[in-house]
Amino acid sequence: MLDPRNGFVSSSAAAFGLLVLALAGCATDARRNAAQAPDWESPEAATAPAAPAPTPPLQPPTPPAPAAPSNEATATWGPLDRWCKANGLAAPCPLGLAPSPGYALSTTNGVFVLRTGRQLAYWNGVEYPLGFAPQMIDGQPFLHTLDLKKTLQPLIGGAAMSFRKTNPTIVIDPGHGGDDAGTKSVLGNRYEREYTLDWARRLESLLTTNGWQVFLTRSNDIHLSLSNRIAFAEEHQAGLFLSLHFNSAAPNEREAGLETYCLTPTGMASSVTRGYGDDPALAFPNNAFDAENLQLASWVHRALLQVNGWRDRGVRRARYLGVLRGQNRPAILVEGGYLSNPREARRIADPRYRQKLAEALATALGKPEVRSQEPATRDQSSEVISRESLSP
């Protein structure tokens, strides 16, 4: 489960409205341009207070604009229109959203909507917090180069579903287990640990039918440490890793919805911290798969949202997820709903509903495109970013 008090939350209606504006406003410009040519937390988190004081959403500082602004790329910021041109896309379509300008990027795969001065963006209606709020420089929208490389490029400019082009072995990690029960259902004496295991078993059957070789980190009610879960994936030379959880905001019963997590890229601030430390200079083994992580999280999250219209809490990035940090493969963590919300707890308690969750995940993962038994291609440039390169 995840404490919902940090990060960005907005209604799906707002996302839909932005997409409608983007699709309506960009059609003409596109034609014109065409004509022109707990067990998942870090060990450090385990020593934190059981109930940390509420902290406001992390707002990473925005680097200042160049001293002599111009419509040119800088060391840390790049013009959005130039990036679009380099990737064969139409120029950004202005949306004119008050109080700050908005822009839509139309592609054959969908629409990406952002606003200057705000970190929250949308890709096909799904929330994606950027690492840095886009800026206006010399009258043009600029994005931080890390967001261009680590967010836009994987979602818009990258090869679709590259996470499938890997070895066909996948490890499914049912969260919690044994004396680590996870969160308790608001409806009674049922716990997260049993629901995650049932979800994983259902998913195992479906993925096996699709051609994946599937291993579960646990197949019964036992406790596993973080290091054991990571070592299990290493032992089986997994190509993908999925950790399954259910959320809680107890005693608050109103919070609801789905969240999907991947590791924060080096150099960015996390969109969720839960009050724990978040050093952007840190690099972990899983940061070598930043692009695949985001693509995997995106496909899985969009598929899960189709299950009875869950509230969209977005694709999030966090650095304190110890079960992801040490993975040498694309890896994500899914929060499949709130056991502290009576309506969602009733759904989660229904085996038919857990089957739908499993089917949604299996649909998103599809069939593996087996090319070799080697691990997925690593992004070597993401492995080390010096502290000097992060300083202003």
PLM regions and their residue ranges:
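Short, basic, low-complexity termini and linkers enriched in Ser/Thr/Gly/Pro
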Residues: 3-18, 53-65, 367-392
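Primary recognition of N-terminal secretory signal peptides and signal-anchoring hydrophobic helices
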Residues: 29-191, 195-198, 203-206, 210
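Active-site-proximal helix/loop segments of hydrolytic enzymes
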Residues: 190-374, 379, 385-392
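A residue-level detector for conformationally permissive "hinge/kink" positions
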Residues: 9, 17, 117, 167-170, ...
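Residues embedded in well-ordered secondary-structure elements
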Residues: 14-15, 161, 249, 323
